[in-house]
């Protein structure tokens, strides 16, 4: 999948059919006698069934056949959604339950996405990178290889205005928990961002920054490496 620029994302969202996907549990006396709309996936037995489809299609169908159902329960998690969730089945990475990843996201081999992470359209995650619990990668956020994005960290997204630059995190970067990296910031290779930092300016390669706003503390040294080294065993599949 090619990297999406802001205008491509805007076009994708603007032209995509807006859908309200629902799952409908039904009970009746003779469900197999019903003819379901072609757009609906129907898994029915004689007296019970489950229907998958768009509410715009299923709502009138259920109303028309109200007398055929003894009970109906509707579940839905989105309304007029333009971007579905990413199909994870063939992604060569470890993705834990509860992560929310939208379509048009690139995830490199052996990456790790932890519970509660949210990754928006157009984001890219490099090989062997870990996105920790509750981290948020906004639209078009770019993260290189073998990074660690700490729990609760926010990499601000940029979809509009279309001319804005995304957050760019180079290879081998460690960002501590609950840090914020604002739009357009470039964090250089091997840098370390301390927990809770708010990064408003570019970070030079192999430097340590901390504070609000984040400021240069020192160059990465052996002591820093000993405290921030990543564990490759966590990235094995």
From Swiss-Prot:
Tell me, what's a Pfam family for it?
Hexapep_2
- Identify the keywords attached in UniProt to this record, alphabetized: Acyltransferase, Amino-acid biosynthesis, Diaminopimelate biosynthesis, Lysine biosynthesis, Repeat, Transferase
Q: Which domain of life is it from?
A: Bacteria
Gene Ontology terms describing biological process:
diaminopimelate biosynthetic process; lysine biosynthetic process via diaminopimelate
EC class? transferase
The EC designation for this entry is 2.3.1.89
Catalyses which reaction(s): (S)-2,3,4,5-tetrahydrodipicolinate + acetyl-CoA + H2O = L-2-acetamido-6-oxoheptanedioate + CoA
Q: What does this protein do?
A: Catalyzes the transfer of an acetyl group from acetyl-CoA to tetrahydrodipicolinate.
Record's family? Belongs to the transferase hexapeptide repeat family. DapH subfamily.
| PANTHER family linked to this entry | 2,3,4,5-TETRAHYDROPYRIDINE-2,6-DICARBOXYLATE N-ACETYLTRANSFERASE, ACETYLTRANSFERASE
Q: What is this protein called?
A: 2,3,4,5-tetrahydropyridine-2,6-dicarboxylate N-acetyltransferase
